[in-house]
């Protein structure tokens, strides 16, 4: 391809509506478990939703430098779009074609990139801009993608725009309700439960909406109705990870931590490398342990045994969380909040543990403190690592107090 055509292609690519022009991730902000989460969700979606996820997965693969795998994901997305056989299919394929064009461009395969640009132009040429178009289908596609990437405010704007033209569209209503649910933690945002109820009426088989409504009802004091919805959703989608996780959140808020752990454990069976889920289990065990510590009967042998087991489980799931990080320092920034991790470390290191486990745990904690630039805490822990084992037990309590 000539240099002139390259320049023309470079002028056209930013006009395409696709993942490469939506600014989905700030630099370095994509979490290391994003790919695992997307892959797990694909299993429980219909063909249209799967295509959306494969488009996103292709973009993630591209960011990871896996161009061949990215193209394979786009092929799956396109096959799914072709099988839809409805009037939206070709319009939604514009996103996939845009992604194809960008990936081929980055691979230096400019003629193939141009071929997909031409496909986009053939669909859009009747509009003012030959390489993009305004329509609810594309707004909805962008909205779902932003929602999956945690860009909830922008996702809500996309769904609002789509619903202006299609106010009763089930897919857009669902996306809008989920975006509003996630944004309600902000004090300036007002959320009506009616949005979730309307979305459920339009999508009666969507169990994720059902558990979100249950959580909202729990906050409103309607615990019994919320739990009824939770049980119904779990009965109809017993292995859907996002449903299990929200159900676990429901029982956590209700105070039933054992049930929350049970549901998180079930979710982990189908997504074994999901470190955030391991961290949630870790936190639930830590909460049960704190509850026991605050109770009486300190000399009860049964209670001491239970507390020892909870410390072991807290440590076990902490290690599992850290082991599933991708970076050399196990991506501490991608864990749950630093204070939460730190509390678990402090709880475990105050007790005796096997030599190898203790050494590894302290080294990980030093890395954690170093990552967060807590130099004084780091120095104290590094000093502790230099002590012979029989001297460490004397110093442990002091180090715990410092951290």
Swiss-Prot record:
Induction: Induced by T.gondii infection in the testes and uterus. Its main location: cytoplasm. It is found in: Cytoplasm; Mitochondrion. InterPro entries: TPR-like_helical_dom_sf, TPR_rpt. TPR repeats lie at residues 94-127, 136-169, 172-206, 241-274. It comes from the Eukaryota. SMART domains: TPR. The keyword Transmembrane helix does not apply. Transmembrane segments: none annotated. Keywords: Antiviral defense, Cytoplasm, Immunity, Innate immunity, Mitochondrion, Repeat, TPR repeat. One of its GO terms (cellular component) is mitochondrion. Component of an interferon-dependent multiprotein complex, at least composed of IFIT1, IFIT2 and IFIT3. Interacts with IFIT1 and IFIT2. Interacts (via N-terminus) with MAVS, TBK1, TRAF6 and RIGI. Interacts with COPS5. This is Interferon-induced protein with tetratricopeptide repeats 3. It comes from Mus musculus (Mouse). The gene is Ifit3.
């Amino acid at each position: 391809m000539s240099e002139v055509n390259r320049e023309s292609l470079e002028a056209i690519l930013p006009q395409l509506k696709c993942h490469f022009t939506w600014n989905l991730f700030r630099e370095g902000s994509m979490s290391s478990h994003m790919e695992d989460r997307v892959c797990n969700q694909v299993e429980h979606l219909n063909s249209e939703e799967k295509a959306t996820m494969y488009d996103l997965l292709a973009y993630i693969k591209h960011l990871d430098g896996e161009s061949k795998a990215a193209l394979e994901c786009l092929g799956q997305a396109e096959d799914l779009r072709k099988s839809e056989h409805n009037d939206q299919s070709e319009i939604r394929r514009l996103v996939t074609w845009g992604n194809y064009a960008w990936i081929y461009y980055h691979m230096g395969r400019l003629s193939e990139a141009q071929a997909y640009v031409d496909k986009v132009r053939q669909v859009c040429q009747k509009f003012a801009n030959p390489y993009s178009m305004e329509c609810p289908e594309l707004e909805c596609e962008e909205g779902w993608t932003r929602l999956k990437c945690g860009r909830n405010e922008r996702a809500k704007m996309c769904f609002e725009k789509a619903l202006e033209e299609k106010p009763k569209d089930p897919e857009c209503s669902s996306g809008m309700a989920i975006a509003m649910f996630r944004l309600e933690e902000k004090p300036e945002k007002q959320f009506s439960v009616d949005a979730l109820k309307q979305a459920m009426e339009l999508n009666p088989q969507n169990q994720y909406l059902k558990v979100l409504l249950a959580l909202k009802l729990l906050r409103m004091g309607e615990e019994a109705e919320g739990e009824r919805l939770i049980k119904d959703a779990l009965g109809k989608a017993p292995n859907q990870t996002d449903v299990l996780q929200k159900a676990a959140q429901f029982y956590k808020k209700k105070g039933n931590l054992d049930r929350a752990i049970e549901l998180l454990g079930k979710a982990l069976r189908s997504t074994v490398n999901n470190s955030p889920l391991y961290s949630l289990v870790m936190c639930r065990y830590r909460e049960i342990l704190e509850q026991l510590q605050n109770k009486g009967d300190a000399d009860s042998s049964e209670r001491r045994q239970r507390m020892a087991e909870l410390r072991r489980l807290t440590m076990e799931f902490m290690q599992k969380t850290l082991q599933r990080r991708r970076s050399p320092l196990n991506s501490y920034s991608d864990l749950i909040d630093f204070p939460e991790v730190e509390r678990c470390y402090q709880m475990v290191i105050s007790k005796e543990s096997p030599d190898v486990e203790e050494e590894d745990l302290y080294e990980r904690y030093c890395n954690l403190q170093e990552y967060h630039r807590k130099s004084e805490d780091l120095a104290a822990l590094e000093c502790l690592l230099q002590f012979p084992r029989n001297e460490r037990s004397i110093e442990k309590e002091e180090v715990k107090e410092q951290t």
